[in-house]
């Protein structure tokens, strides 16, 4: 495994045991044919902390590492919980608001 992958994996492990610090869930709006928001897609992002500052790591890099290390299970649970909280909040304003979540094969 390359030095970069090892560095990212170490940061992912650290983030997972430190209350998912560095992980953020972003939401891409889903619109109906009249351009009204009816839902959102939950998108996981990861920011790796270093001496040079925070670096956003592409999901193309970090998702396979989460899957290979099986950290995807607790991180996936984190995403589900965050998305459910946001969905409940949004349902106060949009009754049938829904959130789409991509899940891992793991």
Question: What are the roles of these predicted feature ranges?
Answer:
Residues 1-4, 72:
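Residue-level marker of regulatory loop/turn positions in helix-turn-helix DNA-binding domains and
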């Amino acid at each position: 495994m390359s030095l970069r992958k090892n560095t990212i994996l170490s940061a992912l492990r650290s983030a997972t045991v430190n209350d998912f610090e560095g992980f953020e869930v972003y939401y891409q709006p889903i619109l109906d044919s009249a351009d009204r928001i009816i839902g959102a897609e939950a998108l996981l992002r990861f920011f790796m902390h270093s001496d040079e500052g925070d670096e956003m790591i592409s999901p193309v890099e970090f998702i396979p590492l989460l899957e290979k290390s099986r950290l995807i299970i607790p991180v996936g649970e984190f995403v589900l919980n965050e998305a459910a909280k946001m969905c409940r909040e949004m349902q106060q304003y949009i009754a049938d608001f829904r959130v789409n979540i991509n899940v891992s094969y793991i």
